[in-house]
């Protein structure tokens, strides 16, 4: 739409054009009051995008305030590009997770690729070098041709971007459930390393300092992407393909190197990624955080399309762009630095004292808005909340143990469930060894990356069992954080902090808002107990298609510190003769389990329960035993129960098996999904020391028979399975479904 054709302020109000942009009548009235006049078309666009849920968190802020966000190691909590945690020796880890769900639903390759690009920029805009990527993915059932297409394209998009940019994709998770059929979830996480003195903030300090635009030129892609992410998907969503951005990983690779060099210069005052809402959010937020204003001359914006209007330039979400503030008079140094990398750096404005965001185009002022009004003063809504109707019904159900005729067949069927099955088809497409710092590659409980120049490592994982959270949001929220910490501990790491990606349906529905509140309550309690504060994250609402919401999926990304790489532990058995221990008791808990879904095609009843005090005690015991060198292998017991955990530890080893004896009712002993459990192996000579240090029950030993045999307490064989056959079933399940 050219400037001549843009509706005037009166038309915007009378024809309710603001509503098409996502503003409500009340919000438009607030804008009018803030400005003391009717906004023009560009100004209406600025407010609509900055006041969207995606940018302002207007529906979720009251809930997010419950998260614990401070701790003795936390250097930067929520509010900047990414959170930062101290790891000693003047070093820190920077990490964040974000969603790119809506774009991936309609343009899966670019949607996933630009999700990766955006999260990388959040990390290096803090001054950190990105060292690892993870992702957490949710899809419908793979039997559906559309789901196959989305799955293949999303994985290809993540691989395409991550591999080209040279940052290893080291871990993550993929789960499949019918509720994600029309609305897949694509959550990307980036982890970076930084020295304390290099930490940078996205703030525009110093009146008279210069505002510069660096990186790729601006096109019309991604206009209103943030608003598109703040509404439900529908049949007409396909028409919003232009709201999906297009990424160029080679450009971003150059941008990383240029920005990391720039950060060493004392000319730099502030730096921020142009992410959701593009130039609008970066300029308004940088000004607002510094208590300053910004003036920008839009004729100077590098444009790759002709005739772009101020509205289009301000709302474009073209990728690989940063906004920086530099000391006045030092602009040429910056231009020269970026030119060396073949990148543009142009002066386009200055910092002012009056807290206003002013935009000029062709000699005229086209917008004048208080920066704080855009960045900080979005209305906050306390949405009505109502317990979901199904919850009381599920809570009252008497939990029945499923009847199983053949335990071996059931184990093989579980190993072939796509959520449990090997994700090798996925991670084989990712370069997880680039930069040669990856110590534990994908496939174990957590990935581990070396901290160069030290004996330390970073353990990292993403976790969320959304079925448990659907059945019981508060309990499920606790479990999501606890399982992430359990995975870090099993890898030899001390859990440090989390980033989260809260994926939910439409918050305007009271039952959905109840899910959000309750799961955040559970997560917050777990974070406090396990001492893993929330240092940042992202909210993705409106994950619905045709009125059907996804399961509540608050994904947890956790990073832990491996104090010495000698402590690194993996899940596979190490040698015959080692003793197998189980930590934690098994109860007949099948609500939301893989077994329940496989047998009934749906989930119901109560989720497994968790006692966070017990969880913490067990994690501390396991970590201390690992650090004391007593543990050969460690694996958390999750989907599919003990039988699956033991099988996975055997599948990962070569030629090894195990003979174990499990007490209690057989189906529960094998397949229940009780929490706070570990499968640990220990050298025979360490038996006494280990048993003094850890409350664990010896259940058997590792053998060189290449078979897993499980007995009941009467010593009757429940199942014997050949490890090669299990490996073949487990590894072949996803490729077979994709044929």
UniProtKB/Swiss-Prot annotation:
Pathway: Purine metabolism; IMP biosynthesis via de novo pathway; 5-amino-1-(5-phospho-D-ribosyl)imidazole from N(2)-formyl-N(1)-(5-phospho-D-ribosyl)glycinamide: step 1/2. Keywords: ATP-binding, Cytoplasm, Ligase, Magnesium, Metal-binding, Nucleotide-binding, Purine biosynthesis. Its EC number is 6.3.5.3. Mg(2+) 1 binds at residues 98, 538. It catalyses: N(2)-formyl-N(1)-(5-phospho-beta-D-ribosyl)glycinamide + L-glutamine + ATP + H2O = 2-formamido-N(1)-(5-O-phospho-beta-D-ribosyl)acetamidine + L-glutamate + ADP + phosphate + H(+). It is found in: Cytoplasm. GO terms for cellular component: cytoplasm. ATP binds at residues 57, 96, 500, 537. Substrate binds at residues 99-102, 121, 245, 317-319, 540. GO terms for molecular function: ATP binding; magnesium ion binding; phosphoribosylformylglycinamidine synthase activity. It is an enzyme of class 6 (ligase). The active site is at residues 54, 100. Mg(2+) 2 binds at residues 122, 273. One of its GO terms (biological process) is 'de novo' IMP biosynthetic process. Gene3D superfamilies: PurM-like C-terminal domain, PurM-like, N-terminal domain. The keyword Cytoplasm applies. PANTHER family: PHOSPHORIBOSYLFORMYLGLYCINAMIDINE SYNTHASE SUBUNIT PURL. Belongs to the FGAMS family. Part of the phosphoribosylformylglycinamidine synthase complex involved in the purines biosynthetic pathway. Catalyzes the ATP-dependent conversion of formylglycinamide ribonucleotide (FGAR) and glutamine to yield formylglycinamidine ribonucleotide (FGAM) and glutamate. The FGAM synthase complex is composed of three subunits. PurQ produces an ammonia molecule by converting glutamine to glutamate. PurL transfers the ammonia molecule to FGAR to form FGAM in an ATP-dependent manner. Monomer. Part of the FGAM synthase complex composed of 1 PurL, 1 PurQ and 2 PurS subunits. This is Phosphoribosylformylglycinamidine synthase subunit PurL. The gene is purL.
